Amino acid sequence: MSDTWLDKVHWTPDGLVPVIAQEAGTNKVLMFAWMNRESLRLTAETGQAVYWSRSRNRLWHKGEESGHVQKVHEIRLDCDEDVILILVEQVGGIACHTGRHNCFFQKLEQDGWVTDQAIIKNPEDIYHHE
């Protein structure tokens, strides 16, 4: 497969594109992340989500530490060609590093943020940093 399809993406000045991961089947939004050209190409090639970690300044294969990989069903480009949507199967049911199903577990109610999603698994049990 040629890489010319990557040229259609409108990358940010620093070579990134915002990505929304959505759960295939339920259409629930799981998380937001960034991809660079290489991570988007790897995602398409491997069928598993590979992001660009801005904090670690490196490729981040989703689930590389936790085992909670995202199997990609579909990759879509928005109408302005500057946002990617990936439909994924979330292995293990946990997309968020906090141990929750998705990263959008805080809801604005009145004048404050309320957590409305339980922790499925303690992050200390997921990430074994030594």
From Swiss-Prot:
Zn(2+) binds at C79, C96, C103. This is Phosphoribosyl-AMP cyclohydrolase. The gene is hisI. Homodimer. It comes from the Bacteria. It catalyses: 1-(5-phospho-beta-D-ribosyl)-5'-AMP + H2O = 1-(5-phospho-beta-D-ribosyl)-5-[(5-phospho-beta-D-ribosylamino)methylideneamino]imidazole-4-carboxamide. It is found in: Cytoplasm. Pathway: Amino-acid biosynthesis; L-histidine biosynthesis; L-histidine from 5-phospho-alpha-D-ribose 1-diphosphate: step 3/9. It comes from Methylobacillus flagellatus (strain ATCC 51484 / DSM 6875 / VKM B-1610 / KT). Mg(2+) binds at D78, D80, D82.
